[in-house]
From Swiss-Prot:
Domain SWIB/MDM2: 201-278
Keyword Transcription regulation: yes
Organism: Schizosaccharomyces pombe (strain 972 / ATCC 24843)
Name the record gives this protein: SWI/SNF and RSC complexes subunit ssr3
Localization of this protein: Cytoplasm; Nucleus
Gene: ssr3
Amino acid sequence: MSNNSRLPENGVQSGNGEDAELKKSMRIIEREIPDSLLEKIPEAEDYIALQDLERKLDSLIVRKRFDLQDSLSRNSHKTRILRMYIHSTVANQSWQQKGENQENNSGDINSLPIPEWTLHIEGRLLVNPDDEDDKAFELAPFTNFFRKIAIQILRSDDLYPSGNYVEWNKLPDNSNTSNGITVTRKGDQSVDVKIMLYPEEHPERYKLSKAFANILGIREGTRPDIVSYLWQYIKFHRLQDMEEKRLINCDKALRDLFEADRLYFPRIPELMNRFLEPIDPIVIPYTINVSEHTVEKVTIFDIRINTEDPRHSQIRSFLATMMSQDKIRSIDDKLTELIQAITYSQSKYDFMKKFSESPIEFINEWIESQSRDLEIVLDGTNMNYAEKRSADYYQQPWVHESAFHYLNLLNSKKQQSVLNASAKK
């Protein structure tokens, strides 16, 4: 779209990216070796050097990822011809078994195998040997060009209750692509089938509803193309609000379509979803004939498909692998645990070392430190330790009241345990 810079800005930012960066920075901090341990761990310098190298690699990978994503955004589609070869084979048909029965002189019908037929669908892209881009498609498997292939067998569901609809779906990692599709079913009669092909396109194209298509003047298109045509319509009819540029004042056509007087432009891609439908599949009718003189005759169909740069599928698979960093996170978590264990061991070492050097002084300092912590827990209440050494301190009314409540609590717990024991019996 030539005038993207003039489109109203979305203004809505998701916090997911910031949260991810915050979590990542926190993990980096947790994996840092404390300065107090640098001199005591000989391998610390090597670890820091590895961290510097990791940061450089991360920066390089991020830049390359942005470059790859930018290359995917460029439209590099080309219309090519896919030649399909469709034929059928049969087995155990009556005309095949007639000769076998005469040879075997067998009159037992129940012993005869069940008749069946097999539909074969294959195809390859017609390439120009002199075109470097076409050479990349020369060995591409037939199903690689489709996201879904469906076969509808047009026969009675009462006589053949199962298997009259077959569907193949492409996996995200392209691991189930092949040079053809075969479907085998039981049957001794000729039957019509409907082969429905759903080409794989990036970005995906959509069919517009009749009302939406009449407004934009197009019948189908990708999401960016549809938004671009809608923006051109808005500019041509001067529907953009003069004060709030992100608001669109609907004319009669848009008002009837969206059922609103004004539209918030950043929400238009979401609002137009109800007026978009998947592109109709390429439908090929074919008749499976089980008669003796028509089987294995190949029928050829040429269909036009939009193909993209073959490297784009590899780039998508690579980017999907890059985004899945479960193994790296697991290693980072393990490093964090090791750093925490080292820090804890160092604290224990410092504790025991000070104690061994001067036990009395260390114990006094430790008790004083614990006392300060206790004061903080008690909200800074001053504690007179000399007063606590006197017996009169424990004869105050609050002591008796606390003891009374404590004994009541013990008694209640004992009664509850007795009740629970009797209930179990």
